[in-house]
Amino acid sequence: MPIVNVKWQKEKYVVEVDTSAPPMVFKAQLFALTQVVPERQKVVIMGRTLGDDDWEGITIKENMTIMMMGSVGEIPKPPTVLEKKQANRDKQAEEISALYPCGLANLGNTCYFNSCVQMLKEVNELVLKPAEEMRIREHNDRLCHNLATLFNSLRDKDRALRSKGEPIKPFAAILTLSDSFPQFEKFKQQDANECLVSIMSNVTRIYGLSGWNIESLFRIQTETTMKCLESDEVSEKKVERNNQLTCYVNQDVRFLQTGIKAGFEEEMTRNSEELNRDAKWQKNTQISRLPKYLTVNINRFFYKESTKTNAKILKSVQFPMQLDTYDLCSQELKDKLVARRADIKLEEDAKLERELRKKVLDKEQGDKIFDDGVALPTAFEDDAGSNNSGFYDLKGIITHKGRSSQDGHYVAWMRSSEDGKWRLFDDEHVTVVDEEAILKTSGGGDWHSAYVLLYEARVIKQFPELPPAPVPTEVAADTAEPMEVSEKQ
């Protein structure tokens, strides 16, 4: 597919054109870049105006220049005096609201896709610079290219200011999603976790071909052994790689860690060669490699034959804001985690010492010593993208509200990589929320239930030793030795 240069006002964009698709798809790409709706676009190619339905009479050549005309909104009229006063009055409020991250418009049952994109866009390694996007285009994968463009648009503060918080309409990405994965029919509700897994498989593969080892950031490695409970027979160790852990939900599961362990330790019936019959076996799985980003699917849906739907388990499953995976790991990995975990105690002691010191210093001096920690590496030196402590901080959640995976509503709750605040991304609506709202999504009713969790490796800081504390003036005066006075002879 040819790559062309599109000039619009003072901007210039490099766009890949698929002439096998209707021109409306190309105009949707331009809309994603400029926010000029297709109805207001006038695209001129070699003196001809491009229509919406076909490319008849128009030939697209590599690196050719295409002109586009059209404004984002209505052509503004000269403001009246009252309008100028109102604009000045609202300027500060508009700038603050414009800095809120952009939402994604629901194009018709596309909330499942929007929540996945809002989750992945907070993974800093997936947000590329414009020059880096060119390397993605070289692999002729339109879905990955459109997703990379979408991640950038959602993290672009300048774009947010220009659009004043207007939501992005992800036409191009939705169209190419269904092309790459036919199970996601256009504008039909789908399973958000299935969508997330599909997007991650595409992105990790194409980014990897382009020189970025994204796969290592999500890869979990497990070791599984099987032991016969009726003999001494033990199966060979099986090593598997996955991009996600599963929390199985049953009547005994109330906490996330319990549900994960339920899948790691199971009894089952299988053939025993030693006994020459079926026997009971114990399966034991342990994690031998932890990634920087850990995704966990709370397995809330099951196929209900009577209604022929993926019905939802409404049971509450509590999840932590800080997750410790140490007990899920193999002994070999546990031994490797010990060193960085010891740094956590040192970090906590240093923070406590600084809190006490701040009480005897002014605010400016106290802030300086409190923020003097240096972040330690979160990965092992010989394993990029790993987690060397076993500790994670919750970064985001995809929740579902409804009774089956094919209906209801999906939203994303994300902690910003920039300001650390939690925000609810409900399609085009973006609001700031607190941790209490996050913890309420554990389930147990018809409210939003956590379905997919994204954890990020905890950043541990190393603090320098503080200088001796200054002695308060009053104390120094009280403890000073009395001066000797000589007696007159």
Curated annotation (Swiss-Prot):
GO terms for molecular function: cysteine-type deubiquitinase activity; proteasome binding. One of its GO terms (cellular component) is proteasome complex. Residues 102-458 form the USP domain. Keywords: Hydrolase, Protease, Proteasome, Thiol protease, Ubl conjugation pathway. GO terms for biological process: negative regulation of ERAD pathway; proteasome-mediated ubiquitin-dependent protein catabolic process; protein deubiquitination. Its EC number is 3.4.19.12. The active site is at residues 111, 409. Residues 467-489 are annotated as: Disordered. It catalyses: Thiol-dependent hydrolysis of ester, thioester, amide, peptide and isopeptide bonds formed by the C-terminal Gly of ubiquitin (a 76-residue protein attached to proteins as an intracellular targeting signal). Belongs to the peptidase C19 family. USP14/UBP6 subfamily. Proteasome-associated deubiquitinase which releases ubiquitin from the proteasome targeted ubiquitinated proteins. Ensures the regeneration of ubiquitin at the proteasome. This is Ubiquitin carboxyl-terminal hydrolase 14.
